[in-house]
């Protein structure tokens, strides 16, 4: 069974850079560490830009399946996590639903929320990376803007806190300091035995 470490945050937080950046030092310590890219990117390239909250279900299922299939490795570092899909669905809640449509949305959200909560236990360490660290252009697939990323950031943060998810919020800004901070947390948590050379 692998050690599973997830970096979660909105677009522009730098979570992918951090997830990729922590893998190489672990490999140099002879740890079988693998970076796992967010399956939602592949889904959106295949299906086109996000258009309906029900798309969060296949994204959740594909991400969960990927998380299970990679377990033969020693150490997995993700730039997202399956449970994030519930925060996305909450963020994508349409504001102009009639009563029947609202009931359908609430049913779907409760279902995905329950599945997402169960997946949280899959991870030994979660890093929350706040947005706003890097300037945003338009994402070619999600078409995020600054205010949208900030809104998702608030929803995701609230989701973690509401479910008492244990996570470490990355505080550093400089990339080397961030990697040092992350590796210190991994060592303190007993997930690595020594600090890598950064």
PLM regions and their residue ranges:
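Conserved nucleotide-sensing/catalytic segment adjacent to the nucleotide-binding pocket
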Residues: 48-97
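A glycine- and Lys/Arg-enriched "phosphate-lid" helix/loop adjacent to the NTP-binding pocket
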Residues: 92-174
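Conserved substrate/cofactor phosphate-moiety recognition/catalytic segment
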Residues: 23-64
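C-terminal accessory "lid"/substrate-recognition subdomains
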Residues: 165-169, 176, 180-198
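Hydrophobic anchor at the beta1->P-loop junction of P-loop NTPases
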Residues: 7
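Conserved lysine of the Walker
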Residues: 15
